Amino acid sequence: MQISALTITIKDEARKQIYLQILSDQFCMGIISSIIDDPKTAVEIAKTTSIPISTVYRRLQFLQENKVLKTSGGLNKDGKYFVYLSKLKSASTHFDGSEIWVSVTPNLNFTIN
């Protein structure tokens, strides 16, 4: 069975600005790119992207606040841990001369709130 991707055009101006901010931030894009297919911890994200860990934590907080990440956690011998997975599969922008259009494709079965 094939899951077809649904592309959503963002109409809310505040939400559109958030996506434009995410798309223009190299660290947000690096983080999202690293967790599209496989969930990772903040430390794993920092290692795979070479983004400083403090920057990873700040951007993860921003992405969580804006509902772009699925977060789950658990306990292991070292204590609590959280893993992050992008709710975005892809995003695109288009300028038609008078308006900017932002479209997003959710990752798997995640919905963008």
Spell out what each predicted region is:
Residues 44-50:
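A short acidic, leucine-rich amphipathic alpha-helix
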Residues 77-113:
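Conserved segment of winged-helix/HTH DNA-binding domains
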Residues 67, 73:
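Glycine-centered, phosphate/nucleic-acid-interacting loop/turn motifs that mediate DNA/RNA or nucleotide
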Residues 47, 64-65:
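Alpha-helical residues within the helix-turn-helix
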Residues 26-28, 37-41:
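Short capping segments at the starts of secondary-structure elements
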Residues 2-29:
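Short alpha-helical segments that sit at the start of domains
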